[in-house]
């Protein structure tokens, strides 16, 4: 069996993702610049986790997130969007092998190549890493903001990672965490649970309809969910509350069948009724869990 390089495997997966008309339907005009990124992000014998982020309704676009979990000691990153972050890569190289499952990386707007990338860091429970990370970036206030927000979160809502735009004075910090399974079940069963959480932490941008929607979505999130908030420099929460649903691996073709007539069909109907997705979901499902390549 021929073994591929990391870059070669990523390029093949990218080709598959864009095949059968999916490029224009899912990614719009942003797709061509993505393949140019891979030679710059496949680092030595370590390849990052790569996420293609695109909407399932509205104008198509494509964002690219790359996350590094470890450092081989041969860290090369010829990426203009990451200019000015060399210090953080050296810092991460020095500590990454001493901590489990931490990562850092970048989020690129592929429609605006050259604009500074957002920086992502996942310290998980290692809160002692937050301020050193932000200090190297010259964003000490963001580190203090993350820690003060983490201290507000109730059980079941622990923060795990965050993202920021460097050098944007007054911009919010995106904070994220994994919802504990017991908490997910409790919130899905009783909207008063999520209301009390929002009130405790000071998140105000919700109404009754939103509470019911959150409970309904979480009742379908049997494979797990994470949550996201925006936090302003003064410590107040913005108007964003997001939920990411996880989907466990299935064999090729099973995911599409699941959403069309299986256990995920109720979730699909729910999202269609709320006008969160349209027919392009079928195009996305056509590439989900469809290929793997040995490297």
PLM-predicted stretches and their roles:
Residues 21, 142-145, 206-210:
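Residue-level signal for secondary-structure boundary elements
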Residues 82-188:
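Internal, hydrophobic cores of structured domains that mediate oligomerization or house catalytic pockets
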């Amino acid at each position: 069996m021929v073994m591929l390089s990391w870059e070669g495997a990523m390029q093949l997966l990218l080709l598959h993702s864009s095949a059968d008309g999916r490029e224009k339907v899912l990614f719009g005009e942003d797709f061509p610049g993505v393949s140019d990124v891979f030679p710059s992000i496949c680092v030595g014998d370590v390849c990052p986790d790569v996420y293609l982020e695109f909407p399932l309704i509205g104008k198509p676009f494509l964002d690219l997130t790359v996350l590094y979990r470890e450092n081989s000691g041969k860290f090369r990153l010829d990426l203009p969007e990451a200019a000015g972050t060399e210090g953080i890569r050296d810092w991460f190289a020095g500590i990454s092998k001493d901590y489990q499952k931490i990562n850092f990386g970048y989020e690129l707007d592929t429609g605006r190549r050259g604009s500074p990338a957002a920086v992502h860091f996942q310290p998980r429970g290692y809160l002692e890493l937050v301020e050193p990370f932000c200090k190297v970036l010259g964003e000490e206030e963001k580190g203090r903001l993350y820690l003060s927000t983490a201290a507000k979160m109730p059980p079941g809502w622990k923060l795990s990672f965050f993202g920021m735009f460097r050098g944007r004075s007054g911009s919010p910090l995106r904070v994220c965490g994994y919802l504990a399974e017991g908490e997910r079940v409790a919130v899905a069963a009783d909207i008063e649970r999520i209301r009390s959480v929002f009130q405790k932490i000071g998140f105000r941008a919700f109404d009754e309809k939103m509470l019911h929607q959150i409970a309904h979505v979480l009742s379908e999130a049997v494979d797990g969910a994470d949550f996201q908030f925006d936090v302003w420099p003064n410590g107040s929460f913005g108007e964003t509350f997001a939920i990411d649903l996880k989907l466990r691996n299935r064999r090729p073709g099973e995911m599409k069948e699941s959403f069309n007539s299986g256990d995920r069909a109720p979730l699909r109907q729910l999202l269609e009724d709320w006008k969160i997705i349209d027919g392009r979901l079928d195009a996305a499902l056509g590439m989900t869990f469809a290929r793997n390549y040995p490297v």
